[in-house]
Amino acid sequence: MLFFFNWWILALLLPIEAVTGLYILTVGAGYVCLLMGGLWMSRLLKHNLMDDVFNNENESFMQETRLIESEYSVNLPTRFYYKKRWNNGWINVVNPFRASIVLGTPGSGKSYAVVNNFIKQQIEKGFSMYVYDFKFSDLSTIAYNHLLNHPEGYKVKPKFYVINFDDPRRSHRCNPIHPDFMEDITDAYESAYTIMLNLNKSWVQKQGDFFVESPIILFAAIIWYLKIFQNGKYCTFPHAIEFLNRRYEDIFPILTSYPELENYLSPFMDAWLGGAAEQLMGQIASAKIPLSRMISPQLYWVMSDSEFTLDINNPEEPKILCVGNNPDRQNIYGAALGLYNSRIVKLINKKGMLKSSVIIDELPTIYFKGLDNLIATARSNKVAVCLGFQDFSQLVRDYGDKEAKVVMNTVGNIFSGQVVGETAKTLSERFGKVLQKRQSISINRQDVSTSINTQMDSLIPPSKISGLTQGMFVGSVSDNFNERIEQKIFHCEIVVDAEKVKREEKAYKKIPVITDFTDGDGNDRMKETVQANYRRIKEEVKQIVQEELERIANDENLKHLLQQK
């Protein structure tokens, strides 16, 4: 005001000396005020602390830029921010046998950016493979076509197998309780345990309870009975369900007529002979009710015969096996597929086998018995495990707190897209803290005071993990003695060549028809064939029960079992 708007002083009706003096005074005072204001403004502008409101510079760090490739590695190209510019880098999973977890909310890009690359690169490097495909046939189509296009990584070309309950035409048949792969009754118990806990996931938290163990033991006894009866001719999962659904007055005499099962079933026999009919009915119902949900002609078709074995990493007969679930029927199909999981884990986790990969998409939709043990021991047997799910709370809910913690704490490689809440906090703690610079400015009329200090703070805070955009991932990898990775932690965008992926997908072939149900006249007989198989199994079990009861009745040492009814 004094400097720019004092022209009106010249128009005052005062002596010229007074006007001149007043004008000079206001111009001088205005000039001094202008200088002081400019000085104060320069202090504020010079020390603008709001340029980096999200602390991006402090929380950016140098990441791995080398490509470290080996016969086992999975390598993902990346872009990361550091020192005010974007840099190219690599995520090198040089030891996939220490297991990998891929986390992220729906749409974060975990399958597109990570899981798909694991499948493709491991097929190129000659891995046998087991893929649990929750949204069939997304991952299965990738595995099938990549095997067609890249068979050169294998000494013996693997065969491709698929389990698909929705469409028997495009499914192989496999009996998960094949008698040749059960050595003693503990194998039968593990199969019964797996199927029951998949059908009743709340039982995971109640293991050891009376009404949890009773149905498991009963169903295990039935499986083992079918294994020893006529050398396992009828030892299939559908036959076991049908046998369970016969009258208990017929079941118990038959089972207890075998010395191997007599002690196993003694609690049930005590309840029967002691007149505790209600208790016995409750125990049997605990097994019958959940298993009855699995009575399906299509499921019976797939699980009642074996076109291949589950030793997928057999060096002489390597396999790539994809099993497909359906989100609309995940509870039923997941229980059956859990049985394949448990058998495969036991068969592949052995010395002297081919390197193999187990890829599980949406892990919480299936109960994977022995998962913690597989992660802990598979490294020495060249089994690479890759688990995809949304966050740790799902794992705690479906696997229990103890097993979930073991899985979370023993995995060597972790990828995480956007996650929130406790999962984000857990990951932030895992990535640790780093020394960060802090600057504070104090401005007053006389002086400017600047304070600079350092303190340890989260390298990747939970808020950053909660706000990751699609395709951005944080995580860490493990290394080897001869393949050292100094900077194991990453916070980057995983680069995917979208155009290349589109071209590949456009050229993909559908999984072919495996079983042709067309008759000589060109009519589709799938429904009739599947139904005939369903009726055959029911009739075979009915015949087994009838023959066994006649055997017991004609045996002087056993006929007392029938008289107890």
Label every model-predicted segment.
Residues 66-86, 265-278, 413, 419-420:
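N-terminal short leaders/motifs
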Residues 1-108, 112-118, 443-445, 461:
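Basic- and hydrophobic-enriched, low-structure N-terminal and domain-boundary segments
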Residues 375-377, 381-384, 388-478:
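Conserved ATP-driven motor cores of ASCE-family P-loop NTPases powering translocation/secretion/packaging/pilus
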Residues 61-69, 335, 362-365, 418:
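A short glycine-/small-residue-rich loop at the edge of a beta-strand within enzyme catalytic domains
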Residues 46-54, 91-384, 399, 465-484, ...:
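P-loop NTPase motor domains
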Residues 80-87, 200-210, 438-455:
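Low-complexity, polar-biased intrinsically disordered regions enriched in Pro/Ser/Thr/Gly
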Residues 60, 73-75, 322, 472-476, ...:
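Ordered hydrophobic segments in well-structured contexts
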